[in-house]
Protein backbone atom coordinates (compact mmCIF):
# COMPACT_ATOMS: atom_id res chain seq x y z
CA UNK A 1 0.00 0.00 0.00
CA UNK A 2 1.18 3.51 -0.77
CA UNK A 3 -0.01 7.04 -0.10
CA UNK A 4 -0.64 9.67 -2.77
CA UNK A 5 -0.04 13.03 -1.09
CA UNK A 6 -1.15 16.28 -2.73
CA UNK A 7 -0.39 19.76 -1.41
CA UNK A 8 -3.55 21.89 -1.48
CA UNK A 9 -2.47 24.95 0.52
CA UNK A 10 0.61 27.15 0.41
CA UNK A 11 3.34 27.46 3.00
CA UNK A 12 3.32 31.23 3.53
CA UNK A 13 2.67 31.93 7.20
CA UNK A 14 3.25 28.34 8.29
CA UNK A 15 5.78 27.19 10.86
CA UNK A 16 9.27 26.32 9.62
CA UNK A 17 8.83 22.75 10.87
CA UNK A 18 5.74 22.34 8.67
CA UNK A 19 7.63 23.67 5.64
CA UNK A 20 10.45 21.20 6.40
CA UNK A 21 7.96 18.33 6.59
CA UNK A 22 6.48 19.24 3.20
CA UNK A 23 9.95 19.44 1.68
CA UNK A 24 10.86 16.06 3.21
CA UNK A 25 7.75 14.55 1.65
CA UNK A 26 8.88 15.95 -1.71
CA UNK A 27 6.19 18.61 -2.07
CA UNK A 28 7.23 21.95 -3.56
CA UNK A 29 4.10 23.74 -4.73
CA UNK A 30 0.31 23.72 -4.58
CA UNK A 31 -1.33 20.83 -6.50
CA UNK A 32 1.97 18.93 -6.62
CA UNK A 33 1.51 15.20 -5.88
CA UNK A 34 3.91 12.50 -4.77
CA UNK A 35 3.51 8.80 -3.97
CA UNK A 36 5.22 7.59 -0.81
CA UNK A 37 5.26 4.19 0.92
CA UNK A 38 2.88 3.78 3.85
CA UNK A 39 5.37 3.76 6.74
CA UNK A 40 5.10 5.13 10.28
CA UNK A 41 7.63 7.86 9.42
CA UNK A 42 5.61 9.09 6.45
CA UNK A 43 2.36 8.86 8.43
CA UNK A 44 3.91 11.06 11.14
CA UNK A 45 4.92 13.75 8.64
CA UNK A 46 1.46 13.58 7.05
CA UNK A 47 -0.18 14.00 10.46
CA UNK A 48 1.90 17.12 11.18
CA UNK A 49 0.85 18.89 7.96
CA UNK A 50 -2.63 17.42 7.50
CA UNK A 51 -4.13 20.92 7.18
CA UNK A 52 -2.00 21.61 4.07
CA UNK A 53 -2.40 18.33 2.16
CA UNK A 54 -4.86 15.71 0.93
CA UNK A 55 -3.94 12.02 1.27
CA UNK A 56 -5.28 9.08 -0.75
CA UNK A 57 -4.37 5.41 -0.44
CA UNK A 58 -3.28 3.83 -3.71
CA UNK A 59 -2.27 0.31 -4.68
CA UNK A 60 1.37 -0.40 -5.34
CA UNK A 61 4.56 0.70 -3.71
From Swiss-Prot:
Superkingdom as given in the UniProt entry: Bacteria
GO molecular function, one term: structural constituent of ribosome
Pfam families hit by this protein: Ribosomal_L30
Keywords attached to this entry: Ribonucleoprotein, Ribosomal protein
Family annotation (CDD domains): Ribosomal_L30
Sections of the chain in a coiled coil: none
Ribosomal protein among keywords: yes
Xref: InterPro entries: Ribo_uL30_ferredoxin-like_sf, Ribosomal_uL30_bac-type, Ribosomal_uL30_ferredoxin-like
GO aspect biological process, one term: translation
Cellular component aspect of the GO annotation: cytosolic large ribosomal subunit
Family per record: Belongs to the universal ribosomal protein uL30 family.
Assembly, per entry: Part of the 50S ribosomal subunit.
Protein's recorded name: Large ribosomal subunit protein uL30
Species: Corynebacterium efficiens (strain DSM 44549 / YS-314 / AJ 12310 / JCM 11189 / NBRC 100395)
